[in-house]
Amino acid sequence: MGGFKIPNYEGVDPTGSWYSVLTPLLFLERAGKYFKDKTAVVYRDSRYTYSTFYDNVMVQASALMRRGFSREDKLSFISRNRPEFLESFFGVPYAGGVLVPINFRLSPKEMAYIINHSDSKFVVVDEPYLNSLLEVKDQIKAEIILLEDPDNPSASETARKEVRMTYRELVKGGSRDPLPIPAKEEYSMITLYYTSGTTGLPKGVMHHHRGAFLNAMAEVLEHQMDLNSVYLWTLPMFHAASWGFSWATVAVGATNVCLDKVDYPLIYRLVEKERVTHMCAAPTVYVNLADYMKRNNLKFSNRVHMLVAGAAPAPATLKAMQEIGGYMCHVYGLTETYGPHSICEWRREWDSLPLEEQAKLKARQGIPYVSFEMDVFDANGKPVPWDGKTIGEVVMRGHNVALGYYKNPEKTAESFRDGWFHSGDAAVVHPDGYIEIVDRFKDLINTGGEKVSSILVEKTLMEIPGVKAVAVYGTPDEKWGEVVTARIELQEGVKLTEEEVIKFCKERLAHFECPKIVEFGPIPMTATGKMQKYVLRNEAKAKANKEKS
């Protein structure tokens, strides 16, 4: 693959000891052997070691194999952040198959589409989400396995009547005997993640064993994880390849603290009790966590390494995190790159800068993780100059780029071409080589011949005290083509007027970048928390057409 060829040196065994298939299953082999007594998982009031974790994976894998699950078979998993879900990142590939994590916030119709499109043989569903599947049971080809709800045993008993098998019954047929690693080809699939589909049907992103292995190693290196690390699962395991941490934690024998709901008092208690060192989340989670802790005069007793992605952290968020004992690290990536592909590598000399300047630097998507590649290309496929002004498209390649889209050769050819994955993100490259995304190409606003970055305007609006979330987009205008429009979601109890917002922007932005229209209200989101700007644009177009008629 990719031109790899074993050299024909005299006396060298071409099947020798110097080569092994790169797969994250090697991490579990090591952890199960050398970290037997180390705590692997904490979940509610229970905790267990890597010895037990290894045994559970063997039981899950062998139980599936005894049910006829074999090489390249798919298993969908719909669940909160539970230990059984974490174990499936190893158990399913140990059985030779492919794990298909599914967002439990999706509609029943969307769940059915993914289960069927992925050709899943089984679907394990956490009891709270069973009813969603039952609505489309007749459309699903896979066999449903119920993962019982520890919170509600009586409800699970009732739900049991709706399925042929429970997870507990499945694993009763398994064995703790060690299984050999089945992966013989590094580029065979290990997981199949579906994109959130902001504008259409979700696409199945094919991740391979080699990519999962090397992505995890990069996470460990970039975020300085080791045997003493404790990772809090604030990030859903179904989201963007779980950012690689389902494998990275096991690679170093770290402890996984499973959080099955976003509960800010609980997050604080777990960080303190378990001495959490790392966590991942979107900016809104950190904003709400800081708000809770500040209202209750709380601080973390140890520094927590907080990965943030999805949007650059605002200065107010950075300040709030510093005040409660958190350190924010901005990363960037997509499902197609197993989550993070680049990091805003922080330089010590930046610590002395004013917070506003630090925030501007940290807002950048930065440079690629070690051993990955990233660039910004113009329309002719050439790198843009490092001037911080010329806009191009972010392209990526490396070990952690997906194989393509499952059963979708047209979309694969569209995005994976000329040796690069084309992200669709518009960006500039600063003189120091750090990349900064200015927008999605489809979200750039063309007003009076000027191109306006919706992200730039959103960053500015997020500086207004009391603003919870912002979506900036273009609405049709006969004179200007489009005008800059902002939908603002306010924190509870906060009052703000359109005039105040526009005045704030005029003091900080060019006149053509300032919103001409400001609306207040909820922002439509996908099930994975991505803003659906196309919904707002469609509403604006419908309104404009109605006014014309």
From Swiss-Prot:
A GO BP annotation: fatty acid metabolic process
GO molecular function annotations of the record: acetate-CoA ligase activity; ATP binding; medium-chain fatty acid-CoA ligase activity; propionate-CoA ligase activity
Stretches that traverse the bilayer: none
Entry's EC annotation: 6.2.1.40, 6.2.1.1, 6.2.1.2, 6.2.1.17
Needed cofactors: Mg(2+); Mn(2+)
Positions of CoA binding: 448-450, 506, 514-516
Catalyzed reactions per annotation: 4-hydroxybutanoate + ATP + CoA = 4-hydroxybutanoyl-CoA + AMP + diphosphate; acetate + ATP + CoA = acetyl-CoA + AMP + diphosphate; propanoate + ATP + CoA = propanoyl-CoA + AMP + diphosphate; a medium-chain fatty acid + ATP + CoA = a medium-chain fatty acyl-CoA + AMP + diphosphate
Keyword ATP-binding belongs to the record: yes
Binding positions for ATP per the UniProt entry: 195-203, 336-341, 425, 440, 530
EC class of the enzyme, as a word: ligase
Domain of life: Archaea
Alphabetical keyword list: ATP-binding, Fatty acid metabolism, Ligase, Lipid metabolism, Magnesium, Nucleotide-binding
InterPro entries in the cross-refs: AMP-bd_C (IPR025110), AMP-bd_C_sf (IPR045851), AMP-binding_CS (IPR020845), AMP-dep_synth/lig_dom (IPR000873), ANL_N_sf (IPR042099)
Pfam family, one: AMP-binding
Family: Belongs to the ATP-dependent AMP-binding enzyme family.
Annotated function: Catalyzes the ligation of coenzyme A (CoA) to 4-hydroxybutyrate (4HB). It can also use butyrate, valerate, propionate, acetate and 3-hydroxybutyrate (3HB) as substrates.
PANTHER family, A to Z: ACYL-ACTIVATING ENZYME, BUTANOATE--COA LIGASE AAE1-RELATED
Protein name, UniProt field: 4-hydroxybutyrate--CoA ligase 2
Species the sequence originates in: Metallosphaera sedula (strain ATCC 51363 / DSM 5348 / JCM 9185 / NBRC 15509 / TH2)
